[in-house]
């Protein structure tokens, strides 16, 4: 999974759930692109949130990356995430 670390600085991005989710999605996009995939190839994702109250905001940012057919997804609130971030997302892609 990816947490909101800026790969250039190695630091957690500042801000709230919108900013953190945006960074996570940028990280995932970079990984997908490097492997020859796009978000259209994602078949399953799992979203981990430190607080389920952030689901709607996370979902707003997440949803911008998918066209007609979003992948299967599970979302969970967890007690803690690495480095006390607000969100972590993992994806499985296939061609």
Question: Which ranges hold each PLM region?
Answer:
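Short, polar/acidic, helix-capping and beta-turn segments at strand->helix junctions
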Residues: 2-95
């Amino acid at each position: 999974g990816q947490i909101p670390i800026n790969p250039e600085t190695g630091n957690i991005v500042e801000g709230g759930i919108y900013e953190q989710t945006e960074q996570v999605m940028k990280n995932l996009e970079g990984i997908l692109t490097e492997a020859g995939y796009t978000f259209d190839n994602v078949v399953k994702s799992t979203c981990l949130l430190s607080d389920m109250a952030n689901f709607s905001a996370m979902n707003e940012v997440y949803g911008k990356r998918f066209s007609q057919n979003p992948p299967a997804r599970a979302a969970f609130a967890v007690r803690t995430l690495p480095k006390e971030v607000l969100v972590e997302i993992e994806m499985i892609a296939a061609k």
